[in-house]
């Protein structure tokens, strides 16, 4: 049974972030409790010393408390219940806080824009992982047992049943993204879902598959619903903005009847005329860029080496649209295993620190508590509890990840590109059965395992040689 987050711990965290009156919002991603704050000067950074807290990330308007997978959701739910009993603030306090919030938005616009991706995609990640694991296990069984694609019987039926979830997810994914994106940008979710469905419909009357829209051009202009996720994100943003403008001038009595109607008509027109072509060009450009980086060993090394820094700044969710674009263009996510090497490099760095530390030191205890999650692809406990506070090991961990990325890039350059079978999934050792390639699942698993091994070894060596000098090993 999952261990609950104690109310004492949450009350202590609440006190150290300035009390209920300093909380602007409460949410979570996969591993972090995210508390929006009005005044960051009231936040005590020593939250990270509390037992049960694996790390803390502070920005100008947000406190991110690292708990780990599963626990973050429970912490956010319990914290929301605590905040439900918070005292109401007076108008002067609210006005002062709004001023501070506005200033914070002006100084962290890029970070807040990228945070939108977390709002859009984080609710979908458990589904990505579940569908990807089922597909990976089914593919592995079919490969090992040599089950033909057209085989009949109980086992083939069971394997097809395990694969159907991935097909369903990716067939209708744009609708889920459209719904979440419209809400994230301040609009109505169902309007975003309807607009996203326009990208899913077919506009070729001669096609024998798909869902025909009923027309093949838009008042004589050709329709080309390319761009998929990129176009849907742009369209959902436009839909939310248009809805806000329409609602501003709509009488209250007509709001429910006409606001969505007018919003959909205007947004759909923009989608057919501008957004679909624009999304297609952006999609092709993004796919070309990252496919060429993926096939360039040095590009892979740079991507893997910098990914831990993206995690620290909380902008790693910005890669998810790229993952989806690569799934559309390649049939697998070739970027994800490259970026996963960052976590493997950190495991090697942590093992080096453990080796160099004193037998009964606090550092060894910290590594023991964080190494298993690290091996399984959950890197935050190692980042915030072990490597980042000591800085040099964090740098050598990045170098270890870069070495793993270089290895995968070299293998792709030599003719065996591989990737994740889903847009998103677990990293670390858990991701092994999710790897796939044109040559099959077993070669892809071997390449990924080789990359992890290279990152472990290089992270260990770099940290032993360069990451332990003048570093606190107690």
Swiss-Prot record:
It is a multi-pass membrane protein. One of its GO terms (biological process) is phosphoenolpyruvate-dependent sugar phosphotransferase system. It holds the Pfam family PTS_EIIC. NCBIfam families: PRK09586.1. The phosphoenolpyruvate-dependent sugar phosphotransferase system (sugar PTS), a major carbohydrate active transport system, catalyzes the phosphorylation of incoming sugar substrates concomitantly with their translocation across the cell membrane. This system is involved in N-acetylmuramic acid (MurNAc) transport, yielding cytoplasmic MurNAc-6-P. Is also able to take up anhydro-N-acetylmuramic acid (anhMurNAc), but cannot phosphorylate the carbon 6, probably because of the 1,6-anhydro ring. This is PTS system N-acetylmuramic acid-specific EIIBC component. Residues 1-89 form the PTS EIIB type-1 domain. Its main location: membrane. Residues 115-474 form the PTS EIIC type-1 domain.
């Amino acid at each position: 049974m999952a261990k609950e987050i104690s109310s004492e711990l949450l009350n202590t965290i609440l006190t150290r972030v300035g009390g209920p009156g300093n909380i602007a919002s409460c949410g979570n991603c996969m591993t972090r409790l995210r508390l929006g704050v009005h005044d960051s000067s009231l936040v005590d950074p020593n939250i990270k010393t509390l037992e049960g807290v694996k790390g803390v990330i502070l920005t100008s308007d947000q406190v991110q408390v690292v708990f780990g997978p599963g626990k973050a959701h429970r912490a956010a739910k319990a914290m929301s219940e605590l905040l439900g009993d918070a005292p109401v603030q007076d108008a002067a306090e609210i006005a002062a806080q709004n001023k501070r919030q506005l200033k914070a938005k002006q100084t962290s616009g890029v970070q807040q824009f990228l945070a939108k991706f977390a709002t859009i995609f984080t609710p979908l990640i458990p589904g990505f992982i579940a569908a990807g694991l089922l597909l990976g296990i089914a593919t592995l069984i079919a490969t090992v047992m040599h089950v033909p694609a057209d085989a009949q019987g109980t086992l083939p039926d069971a394997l097809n049943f395990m694969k159907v979830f991935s097909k369903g997810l990716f067939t209708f994914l744009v609708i889920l993204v459209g719904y979440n994106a419209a809400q994230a940008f301040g609009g109505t979710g169902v309007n975003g879902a309807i607009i996203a469905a326009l990208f899913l419909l077919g506009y070729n009357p001669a096609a024998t598959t798909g869902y025909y829209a009923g027309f093949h051009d838009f008042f004589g202009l050709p329709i080309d619903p390319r761009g998929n996720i990129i176009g849907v994100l742009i369209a959902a943003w436009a839909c939310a903005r248009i809805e806000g403008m329409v609602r501003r001038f709509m009488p209250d009595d007509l709001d429910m009847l006409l606001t969505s109607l007018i919003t959909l008509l205007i947004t759909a027109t923009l989608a057919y005329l501008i957004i679909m072509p624009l999304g297609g060009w952006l999609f092709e450009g993004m796919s070309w860029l990252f496919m060429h980086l993926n096939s360039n060993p040095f590009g892979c090394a740079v991507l893997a080496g910098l990914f831990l820094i993206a995690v620290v700044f909380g902008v790693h969710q910005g890669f998810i649209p790229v993952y989806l674009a690569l799934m559309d263009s390649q049939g697998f996510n070739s970027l994800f295993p490259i970026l996963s090497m960052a976590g493997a490099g950190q495991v090697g760095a942590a093992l080096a620190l453990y080796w160099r530390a004193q037998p009964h030191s606090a550092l060894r205890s910290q590594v023991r508590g964080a190494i298993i999650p690290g091996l399984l692809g959950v890197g935050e406990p190692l980042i915030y509890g072990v490597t980042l506070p000591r800085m040099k090991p964090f740098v050598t961990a990045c170098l270890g990840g870069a070495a793993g990325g270089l290895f995968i890039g070299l293998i792709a350059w030599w003719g065996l590109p591989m990737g994740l079978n889903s847009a998103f999934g677990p990293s670390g050792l858990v991701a092994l059965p999710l790897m796939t390639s044109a040559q099959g699942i077993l070669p892809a698993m071997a390449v990924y395992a080789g990359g992890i091994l290279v990152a472990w070894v290089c992270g260990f060596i770099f940290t032993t040689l360069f990451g332990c000098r003048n570093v606190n090993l107690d």
